[in-house]
Regions:
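Short, electropositive alpha-helical surface patch
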Residues: 56-72
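Glycine- and acidic-residue-enriched helix-capping/strand-helix junction motifs
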Residues: 15-29
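Mid-chain, well-packed structural core segment of small domains
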Residues: 68-106
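Short beta->alpha junction loops
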Residues: 47-55
Length: 148
């Protein structure tokens, strides 16, 4: 069975509280339920990890390699625009990674137009709300199925 890491960066743990006009009213627990249900439908296993700390996210990406994770669905949140270290980790381990953003970052502030993660990801999904995570899993399942 394929296994995906669902990795979330800073402030994703306060979904539903943080700027609901941008990110919606669904909570982080709602996200976990949504993704778990879709993973079951796809027949893939999922592990979840969220951190507000850059180094923890790097560690989680490296751990995914050693744990044999097949793909990563990653919402790096604000680190999208700032973290060369996280981008280097994604590139370094070579696990197919789909970058996900709940909001449509291309229609937001100028500083959000740069994505270090997008440069090393196999695909990016933005502006689809929480459903973007399921889209990312679909993409990975198809990509990895074609590679076998």
């Amino acid at each position: 069975m394929m296994k995906f890491l669902i990795l979330n960066g800073p402030n994703i743990n306060i979904l539903g509280i943080r700027e609901p006009d941008i990110y919606g009213r669904q909570s982080y627990d709602d996200l976990l339920r949504l993704v778990s249900g879709h993973a079951e439908e796809l027949g893939v296993g999922v592990e979840f990890y969220q951190s507000n700390h850059e180094g923890d996210l790097v560690d989680a990406i490296q751990k995914a390699y050693f744990d044999g994770i097949d793909g990563i669905v990653f919402n790096p949140a604000a680190y999208t625009h700032t973290s060369v270290a996280i981008a280097d980790a994604v590139k370094g381990v070579g696990i197919p990674t789909v970058e996900v953003h709940i909001s449509e970052v291309s229609k937001r502030e100028a500083f959000r137009q740069v994505s270090y993660i997008g440069a090393v990801a196999v695909h990016t999904v933005t502006g689809r709300g929480l459903a973007g995570y399921n889209e990312a899993m679909d993409y990975l399942a198809k990509l990895l199925g074609e590679r076998k």
